[in-house]
Amino acid sequence: MHGYIGHTDYGWWRYLSARPGIHEVNFWRPGGRRFAALSPGEPFFFRLNSPINRIGGFGLFARYASLPVWRAWEVFGPANGVDDERALLERLGRLARRQVGPGDLVGCVAVSECVLFEADEWVNVPATFRPQNLSGAVIDLRIGDGHRLWGECLERAAAVPRFEWVAEASDRLRRGQPQMVMPRLGQGSFRLRCSMPTPAPVR
């Protein structure tokens, strides 16, 4: 079993951590870059960018699609980590260093069953992880620092009542048998599954 450590913008994390009712998020990728690092149910860890460089939470990978920005906003809304479509376009434009329009593609990584930790619960990034990796990196959760990371994240998630699956996942980890958990699909993942890229509407 593997997980993925994704470089996470602190503003995105702060926005979503202030909204505990959002359980599924869009970890978007500028330019529609494909994401094929995980299978559904494997953990996606949110590594807060430098100077923080710690794990601020995690969720379970649900699915990926490349969509026009306007459609990504329709599908996920505030789960994109911003208040409105204009703010999403501005955030994407800053990262891409160019103007981004509603019809431009954005990669949508749907992450379900999310828990974002308080600052005093942040988890240390594995020593083998190299922040200079462009977008993130896969880590083996069966051994070493990956095993430690998954265990510490499960400990923190155990305090969240809606995570019924945590007890079984923790037990399997203690027995040296980490196992994927099939994520409960939220509205975003359901809409993502039904989405086909279409031209941007006339505005």
What residue spans do the PLM features occupy?
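Short cysteine-rich loop/turn motifs with clustered Cys
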Residues: 188-203
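Compositionally biased, charged N-terminal/linker segments
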Residues: 1-40, 48-52, 115-116, 121-133, ...
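N-terminal short leaders/motifs
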Residues: 1-10, 57-68, 192
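Short, well-structured hydrophobic secondary-structure segments
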Residues: 38-66
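Aromatic- and Lys/Arg-enriched surface recognition patch
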Residues: 55, 60-135
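Short, well-ordered loop/turn elements at secondary-structure boundaries
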Residues: 39-41, 104-105, 197-199
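Short, surface-exposed loop/turn motifs that are enriched in glycine and acidic residues
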Residues: 177-184, 188-192
